[in-house]
């Protein structure tokens, strides 16, 4: 049987989830617990250029890493990762046994020659080098064999198979393993880094543990599967599997203490794990960040996400490019139309009158009397945002969010006048269609925020005044919305970014519209 090791990458790959902010105490404690558990190799974080923050698992020097390592290393090896081109080796002092033992170097296909020379320089400083090409699973056999021959010349500590897109099945993993194992020089260890987009990390790693080879293989994992997108192989699961089937002697309890003391709290604020968008990214051969970017828009249903992923050119799918994602998103949503007649039709109802804009915030529930009193006044037009309220009749319902329309828009038995943007095909007969792209905001974070798009529309309609209710601002909880079925979750980082961007846009719009909030809000204080 293959000699199997566990390499825990919680502090590095898991760090993408919480921006590496584990805290200095947390970093040291996690490393200590993994050491007590007997984890073979522990990745301490990234080596990068830039300003050092001792609360984050990103370092400028190995001396900074030594400050978070336990005095007794027991049987564990400590490593850090450096992305080629992002860390100046002039900062890397020669190996002296007081800090990390090895450096994992990651690079793209077009960087092979320079990256391998970079690896040699690290090797010459006395460190064990792990050669980790990004997206190995997308290499042709010829490309992979060419790389292996070059790797054999430098004889690093380990060479990695990396399933960046999380799309490999067991038969593909084993085919790559045998190809690499047959051609990689003896004495060089192998490693496998997976992503769990198809829920196959655990089974794929079990298959590798069962193959017959005298080569040591390291399996990357993280505590509780912590990692961006669909996450990674769970350290605790793999350790227990190796204990039960290969007489390994990992201590599981210290790993679970890391879960209990640190990871559960992070999980409450940041999501990771299997989801349909990540599954779609995998089957379309796209980087998982494309899926998360589109999913975080909270405007698309699953079918639309899949359609947009298919629009990305194959050669641009393996590396995430935010510009490409936004370009394809807007291209998909655009549906450019001439809406001049529609604008004039709405203007005839609204020009010179007060508008009561009802956003779906939770404050509507506590302010029903105030809202209904205002709505009953002469020359007041009520427009709700993406929902049909049950306590008041609306002049119009405004809709630009396809996901809202498909999942939570419910006109029940009410007769409604619907204003919708051109990116949505609706079934209602009483509808007015306005051009989607002309109502978009400049900031990516709020590009097609529905309430702001309605306010953008109102700038063309000359209302006397706009009263706003239910535009409360986002908080990290499930209590943002007037009705539970309208709920869309946002993590702490998204919440801050959304609130900041919306506040700035409202300030701009207040120069174009006379806006007054009549319910509590985080905006325009």
Q: Locations of the language-model features?
A:
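Catalytic cores and adjacent flexible loops of soluble metabolic enzymes
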Residues: 1-340
């Amino acid at each position: 049987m293959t000699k199997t090791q566990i390499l825990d990458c919680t502090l590095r790959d898991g760090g993408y989830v919480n921006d590496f902010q584990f805290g200095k105490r947390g970093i040291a404690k996690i490393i200590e617990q993994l050491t007590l558990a007997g984890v073979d190799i522990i990745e301490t974080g990234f080596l990068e250029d830039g300003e050092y923050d001792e609360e984050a698992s990103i370092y400028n020097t190995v001396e900074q890493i030594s400050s978070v390592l336990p005095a007794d290393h027991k049987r564990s090896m400590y490593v850090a990762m450096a992305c080629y081109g992002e860390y100046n080796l002039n900062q890397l002092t020669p190996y002296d046994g007081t800090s990390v033992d090895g450096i994992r170097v990651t690079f793209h296909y077009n960087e092979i020659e320079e990256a391998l020379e970079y690896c040699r320089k690290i090797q010459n400083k006395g460190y064990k080098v792990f050669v980790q090409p990004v997206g190995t699973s997308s290499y042709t056999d010829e490309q992979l064999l060419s790389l292996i021959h070059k790797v054999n010349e430098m004889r690093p500590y380990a060479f990695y198979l990396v399933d960046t897109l999380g799309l490999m099945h067991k038969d593909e993993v084993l085919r790559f393993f045998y190809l690499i194992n047959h051609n990689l020089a003896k004495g060089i260890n192998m490693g496998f880094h997976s992503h769990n987009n198809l829920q196959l990390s655990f089974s794929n790693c079990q298959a590798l543990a069962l193959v017959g080879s005298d080569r040591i293989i390291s399996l990357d994992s993280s505590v509780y599967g912590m990692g961006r997108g669909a996450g990674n192989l769970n350290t605790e699961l793999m350790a227990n599997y190796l204990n039960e089937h290969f007489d390994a002697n990992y201590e599981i309890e210290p790993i679970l203490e890391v879960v209990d003391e640190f990871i559960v709290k992070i999980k409450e604020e940041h999501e990771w794990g299997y989801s349909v968008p990540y599954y779609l990214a995998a089957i379309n051969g796209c980087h998982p960040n494309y899926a998360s970017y589109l999913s975080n828009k909270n405007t698309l249903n699953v079918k639309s996400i899949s359609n947009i992923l298919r629009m990305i050119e194959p050669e641009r799918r393996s590396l995430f490019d935010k510009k490409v994602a936004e370009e394809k998103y807007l291209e998909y949503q655009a549906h450019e139309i001439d809406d001049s007649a529609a604008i004039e039709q709405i203007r005839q109802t609204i020009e010179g009158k007060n508008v009561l804009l009802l956003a779906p915030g939770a404050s509507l529930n506590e302010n029903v009397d105030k809202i209904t009193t205002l709505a009953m006044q002469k020359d007041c037009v009520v427009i709700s945002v993406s929902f049909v309220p049950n306590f008041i009749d609306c002049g119009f319902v405004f809709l630009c969010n396809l996901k809202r329309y498909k999942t939570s828009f419910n006109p029940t038995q009410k007769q409604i006048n619907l204003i919708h943007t051109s990116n949505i095909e609706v079934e209602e007969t009483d509808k007015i269609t306005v051009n989607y792209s002309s109502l978009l905001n400049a900031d990516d974070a709020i590009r097609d925020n529905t309430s702001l798009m309605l306010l953008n529309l109102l700038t063309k309609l000359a209302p006397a005044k706009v009263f706003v209710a239910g535009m409360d601002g986002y908080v990290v909880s499930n209590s943002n919305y007037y009705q539970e079925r309208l709920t869309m979750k946002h993590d702490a980082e998204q919440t801050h970014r959304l609130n900041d961007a919306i506040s700035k846009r409202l300030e701009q719009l207040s120069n174009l519209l006379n806006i007054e909030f009549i319910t509590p809000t985080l905006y325009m204080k």
